[in-house]
A protein has these predicted regions:
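Charged, low-complexity intrinsically disordered regions
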Residues: 3-23, 36-233
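A short, highly charged nucleic-acid-interacting micro-segment common to nuclease
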Residues: 28-37
């Protein structure tokens, strides 16, 4: 290839071959990535499972559940998946925080998984003490330094409360909302996230699942179903 006037010739071997080496002679050109493949896979999976996908969910309805103890305040929401399992309704929505630091760190996006059911009656809020992302870890560390001594055990379960922050109106109500089988499951599986239980509603926000796609949503729905069954069983 000739150099433009006034420019030196390119170095030997320029331009470099593409990653993985040059394609063999006569090979067809590589197909461009399909930007809509993930959405089509999601649409097909939702239809197969009998779920409902809503591109314009009601922001005010989600806001009406606040205040929560640990759940992040919503700035906006994206797509919503709905499902019905017996008496329980499931709503999974893309949720975004209005936090510029978290946005830059890629930690402002979450999955809000809300289960509505008349079986839920008692109140408790828990938050894993690790795994919430760098910004949350730093904020929690500074909060611990500034707050000084702990408020004491909320449940009378030091093993559980070593791993989770807990808030509940009373020890009795907290133990009713968080049965031992549910606590053991959370500990044994190394679960990390936020779980808020109140009359008629259970909110789960997993720390390690943020994408709104089939590989993420399938295990998240299974997980929130397990937590609901253990909370009401």
């Amino acid at each position: 290839m000739a150099s433009p006037p006034g420019y030196p010739p390119p170095p030997p071997g320029y331009p470099p071959p593409p990653p993985g080496g040059a394609p063999p002679a006569g090979a067809p050109p590589m197909a461009a990535a399909d930007p809509y493949a993930a959405q089509r896979a999601l649409d097909a999976w939702v239809a197969e499972r009998g779920y409902t996908l809503n591109p314009n969910p009601d922001f005010a309805w989600y806001q009406s559940w606040f205040p929560f103890q640990y759940a992040f305040r919503l700035a906006r929401i994206g797509r919503e998946l709905r499902a019905q399992f017996g008496e329980a309704g499931l709503f999974v929505v893309e949720a975004f925080e209005a936090d510029e630091v978290k946005r830059v760190a890629g930690e402002d996006r979450h999955l809000y998984c809300l289960v509505t059911s008349p079986k839920l009656a008692a109140r408790v809020s828990i938050r894993a003490k690790s795994g919430g992302g760098l910004v949350n870890e730093v904020s929690r560390g500074l909060g611990s330094l500034l707050s000084g001594s702990s408020a004491g055990s909320m449940l009378g379960d030091p093993t559980f409360e070593q791993r989770f922050d807990v808030n509940t109106p009373s020890r009795d109500e907290g133990n009713r909302a968080l049965p031992m089988a549910l606590r053991q499951f959370l500990l044994q599986t190394g679960w990390r996230g936020i779980l808020e239980i109140r009359p008629s509603g259970l909110l789960m926000i997993p720390y390690d699942r943020r994408s709104f796609d089939v590989p993420t949503l399938e295990p998240v729905i299974n997980n929130v179903g397990q937590l609901y069954q253990l909370a009401t069983g």
